[in-house]
Amino acid sequence: MIGRLRGIILEKQPPIVLLETGGVGYEVHMPMTCFYELPEAGQEAIVFTHFVVREDAQLLYGFNNKQERTLFKELIKTNGVGPKLALAILSGMSAQQFVNAVEREELGALVKLPGIGKKTAERLIVEMKDRFKGLHGDLFTPAVDLVLTSPASPTSEDAEQEAVAALVALGYKPQEASRMVNKIARPDASSETLIRDALRAAL
């Protein structure tokens, strides 16, 4: 199936990027930690992908490197963790931060992620810690960033609304998302900056 895409970014609507390759536009759902690294619209980028088929939809998830994709695949194998929750986890933490939290059994850090309760956090620690033993090379080798241009930091009048919408898409309730963005909002910040700062503040 589709494992890698190289193309031109047509649109960026966190957490979805529209990537055109071969005359076809692919909607790719990305963790915000990966989304931050994307160049601006009109530039070329490469993403590693994982294709998920559901009864009501076919969704493509994208990552900047194979390590992030490997972790995503392992997350969705965990009981009670679907693609949407896995995306939220990797939006709140980088792949390495998540690995460290599991290895150190930092339950408090995990339950701060959207959709993660104590039982799910405990399950993640037990199941993922065991899997990491067999995935050490895949997760801990230096990641190679395949974004071809430096990221841009555009500003927008709708930055706060976009940030709230992205947080809701990641699993936060609308009121909670608005509160998170209002807490860190500033006039010169792009939506990506607001999302990143809101997620950091939540942790």
Swiss-Prot record:
Q: Where is this region: Domain I?
A: 1-64
UniProt region (Domain II), positions on chain: 65-142
* One BP annotation, GO: DNA recombination
| Record keyword Magnesium present | no
The record's subcellular location field reads: Cytoplasm
> What Pfam families does this protein's entry cite?
HHH_5 (PF14520), RuvA_C (PF07499), RuvA_N (PF01330)
Q: List the protein's name.
A: Holliday junction branch migration complex subunit RuvA
Q: Which organism is it from?
A: Salmonella paratyphi B (strain ATCC BAA-1250 / SPB7)
